[in-house]
Amino acid sequence: FDTMEIKQKECFCPNFIKFYELQKISKYARETWEFTNLYSKTRGVNRFLAVLEAFRLLGQRPEVHDRGMKLPDMTSLKKWTQEESKLGNPALKEYASQVNDADIDLALRWSLKVNEDIKELVYGMPPFPGVRESLEKLNEQADAIVVSQTPVEALEREWKENGIDSFVRVIAGQEYGTKTEHLAMAAVGKYPSDRILMIGDAPGDLKAA
């Protein structure tokens, strides 16, 4: 689905600026967010890792320092991403209930609002031309699954809305773990290694393969 632009520009980024109070550097926050998530090698990265990377890059921009902007401490979120492989809202919600950390709570509120906005705004988006026909052909010779770092709820909604969910055996989102873990769960040990094919549009897809 050609949804990355609308999701990142209209749902993720505005909430990134709002929740982390980046209004006085909004121009640079937007540039950095879009670079991180759309126009660089980290395109398609998990949303929480994207927050960490965006703040890392913002910390290197002189425009940010010139405006006296103090960036938030990402230590707590970074620690969680290093210890948890299922980087989704359910795991973060459980972690938040255990640690009583304001920065973790903020990341969770931001992520939940992003999901709300996506559900409200992103609909009626058809798959790329030729996808249905390709899936029909693929199903004649292969078992197909969805491998993504998008929440499962959004993935299932998009695939069902367009009537193509029946072409895949599993719809795996961020709640199932990393893309590498998705592939391992679904294919490794079940199919010869030279019969497993990962198709994607981001460096993270290549890395997972």
Which positions does each model-derived feature cover?
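A short, structured active-site edge motif that brings together acidic residues
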Residues: 165-178
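Short helix-capping segments at alpha-helix termini
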Residues: 21, 163-166, 190-191
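Alpha-helix N-cap/helix-start and coil->helix boundary motif
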Residues: 9, 152-153, 177-180, 203
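Alpha-helical substrate-recognition element adjacent to the catalytic core
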Residues: 2-148, 153-156
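Conserved Lys-Pro-Asp/Glu-containing loop-to-beta segment of HAD-superfamily phosphomonoesterases
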Residues: 180-206
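Short active-site oxyanion
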Residues: 140-146, 168-170, 194-197
